[in-house]
Regions:
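N-terminal amphipathic alpha-helix/helix-capping segment at the start of soluble metabolic enzymes
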Residues: 1-10, 122-128, 190
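Catalytic cores of alpha/beta
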Residues: 70-81, 93, 145-151, 208-218
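Conserved anion-binding
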Residues: 70, 85-153, 165-168
Length: 256
């Protein structure tokens, strides 16, 4: 997914539905991330969503709700090819995250891939360590003080910026698509600079296609645009706004 030099366009699944996952998987995304942190999705929802996504060429990822080995291992066994891990603040936490994603001797992931043996074949364990994408989220005040030690941790493939929590961490209001006049924007560029220095991928969550394009032009390798829930809401609102009954007048001869 991230070997051809092109930026990855990532979709975001917050709706606990195979129908939504299927619709998203057929829209041309390079990858889809199932959000198990802030979305409405739990494991029982995520498993059939992963099965649905696996009928396409889209790479399935998941954002776990915490840097907790059991949850990371279980969702990997369910069919994820990458983990977005929130709130990674220092090297020790980065090491714990990486090791939960990798089989010995590189980590302590327990062997029991279940679906992996179906879609990855009997040699799944031989190549899983190299194929699983590991993105550590930079979004805490402490992480901003430890960028190089996090990014230089062996096995960390890249970082992922959560602009909302990052903004809160530095005393600004939460939100996506930070203006260039904000401190959060300056920190985003500083994080990107450190990622490039450490030769790892840099990802960021965006609210609009315009901002995602801007971030690609700045050098980000991995951009997420909104989510299925936001797209549904925006599409529905645009439809209603276009044909708003509050602006229509019935003909005088219309039967009541």
């Amino acid at each position: 997914m991230m070997k051809d030099g092109k930026p990855v366009i990532n979709g975001w699944c917050a709706i606990p539905s195979t129908a939504s996952a299927e619709a998203m998987a057929h829209q041309g995304w390079d990858s889809l991330t199932i959000d198990m942190q802030h979305g409405l999705v739990d494991y029982s929802n995520a498993l059939p969503m992963l099965q649905t996504i696996s009928t396409t060429d889209v790479t399935p990822l998941a954002r776990v709700n915490w840097n907790e080995p059991g949850q990371i291992m279980k969702i990997l066994d369910a069919g994820c090819y990458g983990i977005v891990c929130p709130m990674v603040s220092n090297r020790k936490e980065a090491e714990n995250f990486v090791q939960a994603c990798m089989y010995p001797p590189d980590g302590y992931r327990s062997f029991g891939p279940v679906r992996g043996l179906i879609y990855g074949g009997p040699d799944y364990a031989d190549h899983a360590n190299e194929e699983i994408l590991k993105l550590a989220m930079i979004e805490t005040k402490e992480s901003l003080e430890n960028l190089d030690e996090i990014m230089s941790t062996p096995g960390v493939d890249g970082i992922y910026i959560g602009p909302a929590d990052l903004s809160l961490a530095i005393g600004e209001k939460p939100g996506f698509d930070r203006a260039e006049t904000t401190k959060a924007y300056s920190e985003i560029l500083r994080i990107l600079e450190h990622a490039k220095k450490n030769n790892i991928f840099a990802g960021i969550h965006n609210g609009t296609t315009e901002y995602a394009t801007k971030m690609i032009e700045k050098g980000f390798d991995f951009v997420t645009i909104a989510s299925d829930l936001r797209a549904l809401s925006a599409g529905a609102k645009a439809t209603v706004d276009t044909v708003s009954y509050t602006h229509l007048t019935l003909p005088t001869n219309h039967p009541v």
